[in-house]
Amino acid sequence: MALLDFFLSRKKSTANIAKERLQIIVAERRRGDTEPAYLPDMKRDLLGVICKYVQIDPDMLSVQFEQKGDDISVLELNVTLPENEESPK
């Protein structure tokens, strides 16, 4: 019977395929893998504030956003400070 079912089965309609793909996209976005839109601006502002006190290269600042669960968000900020303590001019 499985062979008969194979040959008589209908193909999924394009609407059903599109619906399944859309559900996958929505589920991925709800999972929180994307970073907030304000994160690049926040990184630029943080770099400006840090540079007021210590001269650093933009590559020495790392800002990462992580969503844990539905109600917990973690913003991780790593700054590599130079060994010599030159203040900006």
UniProtKB/Swiss-Prot annotation:
Pfam families: MinE (PF03776). GO terms for biological process: cell division; regulation of division septum assembly. Keywords: Cell cycle, Cell division. It comes from the Bacteria. Prevents the cell division inhibition by proteins MinC and MinD at internal division sites while permitting inhibition at polar sites. This ensures cell division at the proper site by restricting the formation of a division septum at the midpoint of the long axis of the cell. Belongs to the MinE family. This is Cell division topological specificity factor. It comes from Proteus mirabilis (strain HI4320). The lineage of its organism: Bacteria, Pseudomonadati, Pseudomonadota, Gammaproteobacteria, Enterobacterales.
